[in-house]
From Swiss-Prot:
<keyword id="KW-1003">Cell membrane</keyword>
<dbReference type="InterPro" id="IPR043504">
    <property type="entry name" value="Peptidase_S1_PA_chymotrypsin"/>
</dbReference>
<feature type="domain" description="Peptidase S1">
    <location>
        <begin position="45"/>
        <end position="286"/>
    </location>
</feature>
<feature type="active site" description="Charge relay system">
    <location>
        <position position="85"/>
    </location>
</feature>
<protein>
    <recommendedName>
        <fullName>Prostasin</fullName>
        <ecNumber>3.4.21.-</ecNumber>
    </recommendedName>
</protein>
<feature type="disulfide bond">
    <location>
        <begin position="168"/>
        <end position="244"/>
    </location>
</feature>
<feature type="signal peptide">
    <location>
        <begin position="1"/>
        <end position="29"/>
    </location>
</feature>
<comment type="function">
    <text>Possesses a trypsin-like cleavage specificity with a preference for poly-basic substrates. Stimulates epithelial sodium channel (ENaC) activity through activating cleavage of the gamma subunits (SCNN1G).</text>
</comment>
<keyword id="KW-0812">Transmembrane</keyword>
<dbReference type="GO" id="GO:0005886">
    <property type="term" value="C:plasma membrane"/>
</dbReference>
<feature type="disulfide bond" description="Interchain (between light and heavy chains)">
    <location>
        <begin position="37"/>
        <end position="154"/>
    </location>
</feature>
<keyword id="KW-0645">Protease</keyword>
<dbReference type="GO" id="GO:0010765">
    <property type="term" value="P:positive regulation of sodium ion transport"/>
</dbReference>
<dbReference type="GO" id="GO:0006508">
    <property type="term" value="P:proteolysis"/>
</dbReference>
<keyword id="KW-1015">Disulfide bond</keyword>
<dbReference type="GO" id="GO:0005615">
    <property type="term" value="C:extracellular space"/>
</dbReference>
<feature type="active site" description="Charge relay system">
    <location>
        <position position="238"/>
    </location>
</feature>
Length: 343
């Protein structure tokens, strides 16, 4: 008669880990508890497609007078990060709502929660479309309960460095092509994009640029996308996250900010670099603790993306610094390649 086995210390540890992962995936037993940041139940995606419910649990929808206008990222039980340009001074705080845990915007889900705003804190350096400081802190009216579908993303510390070429993911509910809205039931869209250095991005944005409308990617910005175009952000969903994976956790590397047209060649998406504002964020919300990002790889030169045009200086041009087409209600995920292939 065989004896029942007794678990040793190593086996007990393995069981504990499996139980913990099971709680995260099921959403039971962990609700109301402090959730670790940057944990998502799904693997990283490639290309552009509809997300799975709960795949990006920090993604929020921001509405004004009941209409979706921007995205945002949950960073704690009561705070969301978005873009400053989503909150014009003439708009009233009371007319905004934040929808958390949503997947299909046009469908009801008991997993989604809606909150009004207690406070909106735009960065003081934000002046106009395309300027520095395109970031805003939003305080929910009351703390939200975490679940499988509602979880925070990690905030990177000020010294965080994300290497060129790192494949990150931008998410949103915006247009899938210029002037083409996302079809009902409007599932959350996701697109994998590689990071591009600021110098190369500046070079790309000044290829065939109009002299009267200079472009300048500033130090508090980061670029991501494809030189050949076709897959990019488009109008409808600024403020949403550019999420980057490092050693199993997702970090809020960028906040969708501005761009020139949708999916145009030599015009990658431009994002507010969240780590540039780590100190400001902590000065406003002391309980928000930015996380040190492990340096797993060095940035590789990407000047070849701009070819012979790289002689462009990274110094700002004189005059008004604004893109040819800035989309005032934000940028949304424009999965142009799949759409173009069907038309």
């Amino acid at each position: 008669m065989a004896q029942k086995g007794v678990l040793g210390p190593g086996q007990l540890g393995a069981v504990a880990i499996l139980l913990y992962l099971g709680l995260l995936r099921s959403g039971t037993g962990a609700e109301g508890a402090e959730a670790p940041c940057g944990v998502a139940p799904q693997a990283r995606i490639t290309g552009g497609s509809s997300a799975v419910a709960g795949q990006w649990p920090w993604q929020v929808s921001i509405t004004y007078e009941g209409v979706h206008v921007c995205g945002g990222s949950l960073v704690s039980e009561q705070w969301v990060l978005s873009a400053a340009h989503c909150f014009p001074s003439e708009h009233h705080k009371e007319a905004y709502e934040v929808k958390l845990g949503a997947h299909q915007l046009d469908s009801y889900s008991e997993d989604a929660k809606v909150s009004t705003l207690k406070d909106i804190i735009p960065h003081p350096s934000y002046l106009q479309e395309g300027s520095q400081g395109d970031i805003a802190l939003l305080q929910l009216s009351r703390p939200i309960t975490f679940s499988r579908y509602i979880r925070p993303i990690c905030l990177p510390a000020a010294n965080a460095s994300f290497p060129n070429g790192l494949h990150c993911t931008v998410t949103g509910w915006g247009h899938v092509a210029p002037s083409v809205s996302l079809l009902t039931p409007k599932p959350l869209q996701q697109l994998e994009v590689p990071l591009i250095s600021r110098e190369t991005c500046n070079c790309l944005y000044n290829i065939d640029a109009k002299p009267e409308e200079p472009h300048f990617v500033q130090e508090d910005m980061v670029c991501a996308g494809y030189v050949e175009g076709g897959k990019d952000a488009c109008q409808g969903d600024s403020g949403g996250p550019l999420s980057c994976p490092v050693e199993g956790l997702w970090y809020l590397t960028g906040i969708v900010s501005w761009g020139d047209a949708c999916g145009a060649r030599n015009r990658p998406g431009v994002y507010t670099l969240a780590s540039s504002y780590a100190s400001w964020i902590q000065s406003k919300v002391t309980e928000l603790q930015p996380r040190v990002v492990p340096q797993t790889q060095e940035s590789q030169p990407d000047s070849n993306l701009c070819g012979s045009h790289l002689a462009f200086s990274s110094a700002p041009a004189q005059g008004l610094l604004r893109p040819i087409l800035f989309l005032p209600l934000g940028l949304a995920l424009g999965l142009l390649s799949p759409w173009l292939s069907e038309h």
